[in-house]
Amino acid sequence: MSTALADPLDTLRPLDVGATRYVYYSLPALAASLGSDLERLPFSMRVLLENLLRHAGDGTVATADLAALARWDAPEREGAEVAFHPARVLMPDSSGIPLLIDFASLRDAVAAQGMDPQAVNPRIPVDLVIDHSVRADHTGTVDAFARNLACEMDRNAERYSVVRWAMEQYDALRVIPPANGIVHQINLEYLAPVVTTTRHGEELLAFPDSLVGMDSHTPMVNALGVFGWGVGGIEAATALVGQPVGLLVPLVVGCRVSGTRQAGVMCTDIVLTLTRVLRTAGVLGAVVEFFGPGLAALSLPDRATIANMAAEYGATMGFFPIDGETLRYLAATGRDPAQVALVEAYARAQHLMGGGAAPAFARVVAFDLGSVHPVLAGPSRPEQCVSLPDLPASFRHAFATGAEAAPAGPRELRHGDIVIASIASCTNTSNPFQIIAAGLLARNAAMRGLTAQPWVKTSFSPGSRVVTAMLDAAGLTAGLQAIGFHLVGYGCMSCGGGSGPLPDAITAAIARDDLAVLGMLSSNRNFEGRLHPSVRGTYLASPPLVVAYAIAGSVLHDLSRQPLGIDAAGAPVHLANLWPSDAEVTAVLGAAQSPDLFRRNYAALADGGPGWTGLAHGAAPVFAWDPDSLYIKRPPFLDGVGATLPPIADLRGARPLLLLGDDVTTDHISPGGAIPAGAPAGEYLLAHGVAPAEFSTYVARRANHEVMVRGTFANIRIRNEMVAGSEGGLTRHMPDGAIVTVFDAAVRYRAAGVSLVVIAGANYGCGSSRDWAAKGTALLGISAVLAESFERIHRSNLVGMGVIPLEFPPGVSRRSLGLDGTETIDLLGLADGLRPGMEVTARFVRPDGAARTVPMLCRIDTAREADWVRHGGILPYVFRDMISVAPVPVPAGA
């Protein structure tokens, strides 16, 4: 970049680090000029303040916004909209490839206007990590990794060819090929610079790294003091084309950490307990910033585990300030010493180093590390904490089977059995202490002659290659393999619904006896239907506990007092006999890990091997769509979109497509796992000649809108109150009352010209960022969602697709109104113009003509979001914005 730096507020200052001179926009200088106290500002908000200051000269940031944020006690700052400019965008392939497809369709639309399609190009750096597509088809053998990788490349050749095309077209795109790890762990260990630089003529500008990530676990990088959170691909598109992301200045809740952990307590135990505490405290949409004396007892990987689960405790971010542990971790993971020196010098100059007096928080939640004991969470929510002795009762309460623990020895599959046990997820495989502990426990168990029960499908899918290199160096790989935990891939796998098939005999036994069987994962979420269609529930646990429960084989074993099994000498083996001491774990870890281990394993990150580099791909600036492809189809979101903005009208005579309860997840709305043969998406694939064995997953087919719209609200565990007593994607078509699939009902309503809404309870859209939960909603013809409350990312995604989110007033709900789905609904006031926080009148009319009127809060939160909805979504908004400026002609000869 060669443009000179603007300095309208006279805050540009030099910073000498070694032999290099940088410049930076000084927060202390700004605070002095405004007469504000920088030390009162939470550290996360200091990073945001610098972002606003750096863009104060480009016309997107008002001086009043800077002043309001800097005066942290000013009443107008909280909830105010500011323009945030992320330094980069991070995306996994699950949401990244659909975004690349959206960009390809935008190029088509721009080219149709006579403009150069290459004008559609990312304006800021974007990293795409391919991690969501690999499945655990093969497990339990030393060649499982190679076989799963071969299957992945074969299944996804069409999808990956899109990525190869995009790599040729988009200069700002960096791609991490398959089989390298999970996006958030790679971001933590390698990609994140913490402080980044850009050159402006002779000046080298230093500023904090920041990002938006197209996955709800993006806040994992908050552990490094990096400002970033999860958004949908819909919203990320605006950042990629160079527009700021509209951000409401959040509530910042301090979490004061004290004490030290008890012996044998893993960080998984800490984060699951903390998730329950923060959910109870209520931090929805807030930034949780950690401080206090207990931070000294948390390693950077511990902090990353805690920050990773911000979405699970409902926060936008889980932020840790930079401190000495941050600098130690950067050095330990092989970062350049000059970069580590820059991070320290910059953080000190900008008052971004933690450890001093606590800033001013909206409120403080106390958390004592010493109060934590080993726990699990489940069977369907991450905040459902349960201690080891209480696990059998938790299962019986959830599934009411009356099951009892089975005797040891050969037997039939039973209620409470664990059929999938997986050490997976960036949440915990990024934590070396926990992985070494799992390896030591497995080694100890193998030495006693124990192994996983035969009905348990075991797998190990770490988030980076460093993990397996560390286990090899520690001599622990063989022990894990002896229990059954062979490497199956580097990717999300079981955590994201890619657990692969169960053996036919297991599946048949589950179906025959209607068994409530379970999964045991070292993961971050366990929503219904996510892991496997045959698995009724999932418990989250630390990696060593996953190994232990694979050996026990059932959640009806109380591992706090019952043995895991019997050794070769006939002696009972208890968990305490196998559990390694903290001192042993620390010693083994210290000998196995080094900065060079990280450097070696990240040296060839972008290579990909011949299976990747040899993929055929087009070279033209517009993508060559294959009309016969069932993986890649041109999306319809710009079909019929012209230069003229259509008017917004009131909604009259709309029908509810679904009537849903509380805590509807984006997995319920848009499942990511295997596509069932009897579902509308499966029937579509069958009709197009695809055998059920080749259906793959919804994640893999996200670039085919025909599959995805049929998969919307098709989760096998979703419960629509319009069809009482049933599970799955069914609804009642009105007024005839016929029970049909959600997709079929939507088709019938569209043919009749009937508008649609969804009515739901509290916490609607929690879970994954999953933009297809909003895209599918829009493609079904749903104009609005009426709920008691919304989770942050899904609310934003709905707005980004032109769907209006409306909240019932406090004390009013579908139940208090007695709604049953037979009503018609009018939404009045929309035609008067969309405004943030406006009131919309909802009128519910029963079949007998009786009507109730309710004032609804329109959850369009910012003026920018109102623009998106007026345009019918972000993509039409970006398209119209591009064609409204001076056109970029197609180059001669193109």
Kindly give the residue locations of the regions a language model identified.
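Acidic, glycine-rich flexible loop/linker segments
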Residues: 567-584, 795-868
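Long, structured ligand/cofactor-binding scaffold of large enzymes
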Residues: 57-257, 269-272, 374-377, 396-485, ...
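Terminal amphipathic helices with adjacent charged low-complexity linkers/tails
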Residues: 85, 103-158, 289, 295-402, ...
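Mobile "lid/hinge" segments at catalytic clefts and subdomain interfaces of large enzymes
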Residues: 200-347, 353, 437, 442-454, ...
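Extracellular/luminal Protease-associated
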Residues: 258, 291-298, 524, 746-747, ...
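Conserved short loop/turn motifs at secondary-structure junctions
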Residues: 91-96, 290-297, 316, 325-333, ...
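N-terminal amphipathic, basic-rich helices that act as targeting or association modules
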Residues: 2-151, 298-336, 627-670, 675-676, ...
